[in-house]
């Protein structure tokens, strides 16, 4: 009981301020986040990740992508119908690309609160999010432009 309570407190703290270690590589941080989500939901799915090796993102994009990975992994783990969940991040000079894909049960064409909130946040940042559901496969594609001025402003603050 105590261990479960401690875990829930850590998760709530992480919700308000992500557990992002400044000296730890993002691929390792994001993989740790996914592992915690899989453990929390007692998922038996295999989560295959493709992240650039030892990549870095300027602030605030490191935390923004952390939140996107958190929501995508949580959605996939909770609603996947089994099989493999794949999560890919690709970073270019001017944009971040994220793709999540998993098997799913046939569902109604509605977004849950998590995906709706994620869509709204991405839109505010000038990005795009597309959702595809075909042959019992659920795929989310995100394109998030990197605004260098936002990075500089965050650095100055």
Outline where the language-model segments fall:
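Short beta-to-alpha transition helix within the HATPase_c
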Residues: 3, 7, 18-43
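Short beta-strand/loop element within the Bergerat-fold HATPase_c
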Residues: 84-94, 132-135
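Conserved short strand/loop->alpha-helix "switch" segment adjacent to the catalytic nucleotide/phosphoryl-transfer site
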Residues: 44-69
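Short C-terminal beta-strand
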Residues: 138-148
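C-terminal end segment of the histidine kinase catalytic
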Residues: 147-157
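Conserved ATP-binding N-box helix of the HATPase_c
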Residues: 62-84
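Conserved DxG motif in ATP/Mg2+-binding regions
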Residues: 96-105
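ATP phosphate-binding glycine-rich loop and adjacent ATP-lid/helix-beta elements
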Residues: 108-139
